[in-house]
Amino acid sequence: MAHDLASYVGSIPECYDRYRATDFEPFAEDLADRVASAAPCGSVLELACGTGILTVRLRARLPFSVRIVATDLNPPMLEYAQTKLGGMPGIEWQQADAVTLPFPSGSFDAVACQFGFMFVPDKAAAFLEARRVLARGGLLAFNVWDRLQENQSMRVVQQTISSFLGREPGFFAAPFGLHDRSLLHDLVQSNGFQQIEISTVSIRTVSPSARWLATGIVTGSPASLELQQGGIAPEPVIEAAAAALARAFGDCPCETDRSAVVVTARAP
């Protein structure tokens, strides 16, 4: 991550996992299914594992004989995942930077990444590294968020935070900045992949309440660091965001549509 506004530190990992899992779990199920339905493999490398939301689903969907190595650049996220899932057998944990992976060439049959490539400053290097560590014919499977306009709950909270900061929060540029299908195709193809397939997955996610969702987005992302740096307490922002979300999507539960772009490709 380039700077601390893209870092998941302090209480962010816990809030991210507690409040935002409902946003990520359906997409994790989809991605794990794609990995599991591919040709049989003996090893999977997960990049940007975060708090282990995809990791759990990969372990559940793949035979126990399949080796799973879960990595993340941010130590607090990796430590949280290890604490939460440390008792789950068949998972290896390792800190790793996606642009300089500490693994031999051709050592994995699949590389999976949920909502991580958007945050990598040198995306070409990350895809090149993914290609390097894949065996011949290995699978690359990842998702990224669709544009912000297709994820209206996030847009509502972004606008609320903007009203407090007096400007757009910088954090939101990264998660929703890699949705262009042509750019994705070119990035993947130019770094050695073939058989590229790109699709859109839209899922309705359900949060217990609008306040629950607002709390997750405000406190479970580096946007909270921007508020802190601006001397703004999170509670008034959460209250305002919850009210806006309830008006737009209802309350108890709060149902919102989320959209992601999913890419699969093969190493030659």
Task: Describe the predicted segments one by one.
Residues 3-6, 23, 51-53, 177-268:
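Conserved Class I S-adenosyl-L-methionine
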Residues 43-101, 125:
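Class I SAM-dependent methyltransferase SAM/SAH-binding core
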Residues 22-41, 57:
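Conserved alpha-helix/loop element of class I SAM-dependent methyltransferases that forms part
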Residues 109-123, 146:
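A short SAM/SAH-binding and catalytic strip from SAM-dependent methyltransferases
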Residues 99-111:
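A short acidic, Gly/Pro-enriched loop at the edge of an enzyme's catalytic core
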Residues 1-14:
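N-terminal, positively charged/glycine-rich alpha-helical extensions of SAM-dependent methyltransferases
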Residues 32, 56-59, 127-131, 158:
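A structural alpha-helix within SAM-dependent methyltransferase catalytic domains
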Residues 124-125, 131, 135-208, 224-230:
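Conserved catalytic/acceptor-binding region of the Class I
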